[in-house]
Amino acid sequence: MSKIRVLSVDDSALMRQIMTEIINSHSDMEMVATAPDPLVARDLIKKFNPDVLTLDVEMPRMDGLDFLEKLMRLRPMPVVMVSSLTGKGSEVTLRALELGAIDFVTKPQLGIREGMLAYSEMIAEKVRTAARARIAAHKPMAAPTTLKAGPLLSSEKLIAIGASTGGTEAIRHVLQPLPLSSPAVIITQHMPPGFTRSFAERLNKLCQISVKEAEDGELVLPGHAYIAPGDKHMELARSGANYQIKIHDGPPVNRHRPSVDVLFHSVAKHAGRNAVGVILTGMGNDGAAGMLAMYQAGAWTIAQNEASCVVFGMPREAINMGGVSEVVDLSQVSQQMLAKISAGQAIRI
């Protein structure tokens, strides 16, 4: 099998050296070239035709976003962004994902060499995932039309969503059409700390429903969406007649914190047939067992189809485990989940 050919673009000579060490330390990939800025990278892309590009967000001559926008328009290819762990860095990274980047890695704030080398396996996994990703599925999406509100729903009704690679844009596509009368939506998206708050704030500006980073102990309200905070598990709990959010520091599940399985298992336990579960694009199997538990508890469960996924890992695993009621294109997910929950069809006969 041929190696994954990687090109790294970063204005830091140290970062270029570190990325080269990381990539070349894995037998299934190789660094074919590095570039100090996008203008040099443009020529190297033509020369080496890499499978994956790693791209620094902030660079001289042309910043990473401008370059990414041109690249995805003229020569679409898998891109993994390299971002700083700052408020501004998270906003720029989310914009990069919107423009078509597959994923991102964050630079440690201290001890760059030691920190990046510690991330070696994670970086390699993201590069492998990017090399297999569907670029055509990751074109920026137009804002969808708002769906018509169904009948007033009981506060018992609930939608739970899980996603990973490619999920930020998929979640946006699912939430934007939801009317204010929608049931509560609770979401686990694999993301590091700091990024989930920026992600929630970005969605809140784009959606009719309110979107926020979830907080421990808050009540779950209709017309609101709650994003699990980075590096924390989120679970659904009961507080009398109401649903409540629990945030905790439990060990990683399926190597993830937050974990979709943790959320889905809690929804199966506390919401049962009053819930609709949705599993979107993502690598790995997180959420598959939890979705089966939701299905067995009477929930209607939806998996995104392969054609519209950036990475069809998590939905495939959920389908293979037998916990999926229906498989639909991303463009139909919002409509289907509202139709099922509004018609009371979260309950399977």
From Swiss-Prot:
The modification 4-aspartylphosphate is found at D56. Residues 5-122 form the Response regulatory domain. GO terms for biological process: chemotaxis. It is an enzyme of class 3 (hydrolase). SMART domains: REC. SUPFAM superfamilies: CheY-like, Methylesterase CheB, C-terminal domain. Residues 152-344 form the CheB-type methylesterase domain. GO terms for molecular function: phosphorelay response regulator activity; protein-glutamate methylesterase activity; protein-glutamine glutaminase activity. It is found in: Cytoplasm. Phosphorylated by CheA. Phosphorylation of the N-terminal regulatory domain activates the methylesterase activity. Gene3D superfamilies: 3.40.50.2300, Methylesterase CheB, C-terminal domain (3.40.50.180). Signal peptide: none annotated. It holds the Pfam family CheB_methylest. Involved in chemotaxis. Part of a chemotaxis signal transduction system that modulates chemotaxis in response to various stimuli. Catalyzes the demethylation of specific methylglutamate residues introduced into the chemoreceptors (methyl-accepting chemotaxis proteins or MCP) by CheR. Also mediates the irreversible deamidation of specific glutamine residues to glutamic acid. Contains a C-terminal catalytic domain, and an N-terminal region which modulates catalytic activity. This is Protein-glutamate methylesterase/protein-glutamine glutaminase. It comes from Salmonella typhi. The gene is cheB.
